[in-house]
Amino acid sequence: MPVDPATEDHCDRSRRTLLRTLTGGGALATLTASALSGTSAAALARPTADTSDSHRFAADAFRPSGRVREYWIQAESFEHNAVPNGRDGMTGRPFTPDQTTFWAVGFRAYTAGWSCPLKADLGPQGIGSNSGIPGPVLRAEVGDVIRVHFRNMDEHYKWPHSMHPHGVRYDRSNDGAWLADDPHQPGTAVPYGASYTYTWFCSPSSVGTWPYHDHSQPQSITAPSADGTRKPGPGGGPVMEIGAELGLFGVLAITDQHTPQVDREFILFLHDASPADVPSLAHPLDMFNGGAFVDNTPTFRAKTGDRVRWRIAALGNDFHVFHVHGHRWHSPAGWVDSQLLGPSTTLTVEYVEDNPGHWIYHCHVTEHMMGGMVGRYLVTE
């Protein structure tokens, strides 16, 4: 969604924070948090656990820093073309806009009171493009409270939406996940035009890269039929997390005092959309950050000597293999140049850039690469 430059300048907000290398969205932590029964910091600092595990829970107890990170986030619908240049840059295959355009829904960050959208900030401490797909990067440090003021302004579908986080601590009223047997749980189905405030807590095991996404009531997109009526698309009934399929997702980046600064940070979401769920599409699309195929997906840039970090997340039904040509990084298994991601998992990659050239990054599942998951990575000296 284009934003007027004057509005962007007026709404600019700087953000500074530290970053940390972590693979798998906090997977180095051995703790699995128990269910939380209260909303206060004191309650969250006293999780219930078996006494044999009490030392692990104590190590992960939420200890408030006194900082509250406030975000004003809005869900918005907009017409989105995933292949705006009309071609597959690897094979030369052409596309027309009617084959690759759909009504998307995305999260955008605003100034207080949803007054105006924040300016894009692609720096290593920034919120990202703030264009809707993906949503803004929500940054915090261990000990911080994240307070998200969410408003649903999905004017096209007018569906209820929510925000569900991974990796942070919260109680049921701040979960954002809708259940049919508990349909009136606050924050799980925020109606069109309404708002809700979520409160999340960053404990030591929250350090890393995590997704957040819509987890509201299942819906289906209707399509025109031969008799002039509208019926559900080829997939039939309501689709779970269809808001996330349409673009309602983003990254949480949680750091601590050990997190090193970087020169470049790249945010990358691997996701897909199917004609079975989105009838306006001519065929399935495999996307990076809402775009499919080279020059529609992000082109990332770095210089030799830069400390580079990739924060990568995947949503949908598929497993992916992230690969960057000409580069390696260290994982718990050793040095690698490809790593597997499943649905709702994350990967944080960090290295010092030492290999100039015009490279590509892509999903190494051939079907996904041919479906659009490929982009450029340009390194200069």
Feature-to-residue mapping (PLM):
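Acidic-aromatic/histidine active-site loop/patch
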Residues: 264-302
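Intrinsic-disorder/low-complexity, polar/charged segments enriched in Ser/Thr/Lys/Arg/Asp/Glu/Gln
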Residues: 66-70, 133-135, 143-147, 195-199, ...
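N-terminal export leaders
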Residues: 14-31
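Histidine- and aromatic-enriched segments that form or immediately flank copper-ligand environments
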Residues: 80-253, 317-343, 362-365, 369-377
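N-terminal secretory signal peptides
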Residues: 1-14, 30
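Low-complexity, Pro/Ser/Thr- and charge-rich linker/hinge segments at domain boundaries
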Residues: 256-267, 381
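C-terminal segment of N-terminal export signals and the immediately downstream linker at the start
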Residues: 8-12, 33-72
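Mature N-terminal segment immediately following signal peptide/propeptide cleavage
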Residues: 66-84
